[in-house]
Every structure is written in C-alpha cells, then in structure tokens.
C-alpha cells in the first residue's frame, strides 16, 4: 500500500517536472521569437536610416565640390590682381592698372557682384566700426532714420576702405575687400545725394577719404615693410582713387585735392636738395599725381557732363589745375618732364571742355584760362 502511494507521488512529481520543463521551453521559445522579430525590425530601421544619411552625405559632398569649383573659377579669373593667389571675386577691379581705357571705368564690374562677399563685407565693416565708435556718439535721429542709416553706412565703408589701404593692412584683405568698400560707398553716396539733406557732412566725409588716400598713395614704403609686388603700392592706391572717381561727386573733389597737392609738392621740390634721401619718393609722387589727374579727366569728364554736374565745383578744380600748372612751371629748369606732363593734362582738359556745350554756363574767365591750353598737347 505504502509502496503504491510512493510510486504515485513519484509519478506526480515527474509529471510536474515535465510540465514545468515544457512551460519553460515554450516561454523560452516565445521570448526568442519575440527578440528575433524585434532585432529584425531594428535592423531594417537602422539600415533605412543609414541609407538616408548616406544619401545626404553624398549630396553634401557634391555641394562642397561644386562650391570648391566655383571658388577656383573665381580665383583663376582674377588674372592681374594685386595678390592673384588670394583673389576671391570676378570684379577685375585691378585690371588695366595704370593704363588708359577706351571705355568708362566700372562697366566691367557691373552685374558681377558676389552677394556672399557683400554680406560678409558689411558684417566685417560694421564689426570693426563698433570697436571704434560708441553708440552714444552715433544716436539716430527719429526724424531722419533713413538718412542717418545711409550716412552711417557711408562712414563705415570709408573707414573700412582707409583701414584696408594702410601700410600694415593684410594683403589678401586689400585685394578681396577694396572693391566691395567702393561699391558700398557708391550706393550710400547716391542715396544720400538723392535725399538732398546735409550734403556738407557728406562732402566732408568724401574729402577726408580722398585726402587720406592721396597721403597713402604718396607715402613711401619703409624698407622693412616692402612687399613683393611688381608695381609700387602707390599705383594700386592710385587705381583705387581712379575707380572712386567714376562718381562725379567724388571725382571732381579728387581732382581738386590732387591739383592742390601738386602745387604744394612743386613748391617743396623747388627748395629741396636733389640729393636728399626723400627726393626720389617725392619725384615719383609727382608723376603719380599728374597721371591720376589725366586718368580722371580722360576717363570721366565727358560722362560727368551727361549727369548732374556741379558747375561750382568744376570752376574750383579748373582754377586749381591751372594754378598747379603754374607751380610746376617753376620746376622747368630742374625737371622739364613735370611741365610737359602738366601741359598734356591741360591740353586734354581743354579739348574736352570745348566739346561740351553745357560748360558754357561756367564763368567765362575760368573757361578762358583752360581753353588757352587747347593747342598744347
């Protein structure tokens, strides 16, 4: 009896054990199946994400390659820039350096603006301006917000251009940003002139810019600052003024300032020892100044006459050029080339003045002075 009970208990335990093992196997099998399906879904999702990011990476790489090609094209197009390896736009700003052009300066650069460079220039110029000026001195007047904003843009662009033209300025910055500053100066100046308010302040800013650029053009480079250039730095600043002179408001004042500088320089050379160390630099400066006046007159005088022309300013710089010619005449015994070049300038001026009927409104005495040189070339 007892043995049969023991066998029954043993059999019951074996069945319970088998049932437990079966349940465990089923549970394990179910968990393995669930895990494998989850892994499969994760794998498919991960593979899809990988393909998507791989496609994006390919698109980004193509975009980078395209931008690099555009940059190479931009650099290669700047054939005769001041620093060809660092050129970054297609404006041809320093083409025809020191060469007479048969067209109006500025046409080659029209519709070649690089929007990215323009935005970068404005940000950089404003950032540098904030370092120099306090907001307390630059408060905007609520009654004239547009005028003050454009006036501020003009001041910022002028300050930035003058900073670029300094002797210790970075070479690549000068070649990359100088034409951007010129473009912004033109845009702001035209808007300010069209507003017709407070032009005295605008004229003061422009005159200051011209004076500083002329000083930089005639400042000799120190021995330890000589840059590896094929042409004197003064000729690049000369070309910069020549570009700025395409705008009548700037060009006429540039001729006036340059002719005055020629008169002062001629007086200094008259009493200077020709063996003085600074004589060669002053001699070179004289030729650069005379050449610059000739460029401005030959390039722009006729186009200026077709625009809003300031006859009062015209009379002033005509008289100043005549006075400069007289000052140079005193140097004829020292260097007759000065007078020959100035006679050529006055001759070109007289020929162009004679072609423009609108100049008949100018004071006759002023015209008589310049027309007297019409036969001199």
UniProtKB/Swiss-Prot annotation:
Expressed in roots, stems, leaves, inflorescences and seedlings. Strongly expressed in meiocytes. A motif (Nuclear localization signal) lies at residues 117-124. The keyword Signal does not apply. One of its GO terms (biological process) is meiotic DNA double-strand break formation. GO terms for cellular component: cytoplasm; nucleus; spindle. Involved in meiotic spindle organization in meiocytes thus regulating chromosome segregation. Required for formation of meiotic DNA double-strand breaks (DSBs) during early recombination processes. This is Protein MULTIPOLAR SPINDLE 1. It comes from Arabidopsis thaliana (Mouse-ear cress).
């Amino acid at each position: 009896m007892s043995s049969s009970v023991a066998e029954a208990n043993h059999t019951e335990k074996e069945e319970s054990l088998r049932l437990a093992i079966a349940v465990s196997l089923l549970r394990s099998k179910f968990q393995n199946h669930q895990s494998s399906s989850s892994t499969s879904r994760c794998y498919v999702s991960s593979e899809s994400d990988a393909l998507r990011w791989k496609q994006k990476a390919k698109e980004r790489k193509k975009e980078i390659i395209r931008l690099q090609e555009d940059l190479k094209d931009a650099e290669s197009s700047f054939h005769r820039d001041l620093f060809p390896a660092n050129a970054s736009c297609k404006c041809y700003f320093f083409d025809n350096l020191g060469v007479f052009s048969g067209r109006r300066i500025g046409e080659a650069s029209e519709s070649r603006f690089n929007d990215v460079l323009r935005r970068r220039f404005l940000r950089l110029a404003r950032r540098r301006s904030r370092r120099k000026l306090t907001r307390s001195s630059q408060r905007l007047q609520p009654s004239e917000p547009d005028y003050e904003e454009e006036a501020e843009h003009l001041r910022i662009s002028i300050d930035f251009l003058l900073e670029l033209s300094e002797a210790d300025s970075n070479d690549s910055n000068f070649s990359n940003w100088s034409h951007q500053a010129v473009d912004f100066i033109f845009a702001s100046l035209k808007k300010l002139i069209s507003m017709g308010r407070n032009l005295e302040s605008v004229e003061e800013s422009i005159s200051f810019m011209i004076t500083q650029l002329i000083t930089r053009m005639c400042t000799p480079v120190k021995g330890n600052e000589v840059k590896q250039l094929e042409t004197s730095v003064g000729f690049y600043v000369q070309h910069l003024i020549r570009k700025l002179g395409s705008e009548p408001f700037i060009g006429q004042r540039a001729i006036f300032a340059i002719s005055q500088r020629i008169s002062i320089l001629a007086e200094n050379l008259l009493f200077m020892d020709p063996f003085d160390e600074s004589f060669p630099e002053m001699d070179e400066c004289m030729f650069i100044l005379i050449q610059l006046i000739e460029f401005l007159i030959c390039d722009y005088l006729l186009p200026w006459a077709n625009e809003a022309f300031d006859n009062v300013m015209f009379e002033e710089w005509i008289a100043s050029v005549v006075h400069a010619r007289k000052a140079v005449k005193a140097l004829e015994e020292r260097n007759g080339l000065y007078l020959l070049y100035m006679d050529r300038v006055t001759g070109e001026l007289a020929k162009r003045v004679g072609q423009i009927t609108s100049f008949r409104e100018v004071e006759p005495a002023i015209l008589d002075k310049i027309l007297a040189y019409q036969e001199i070339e």
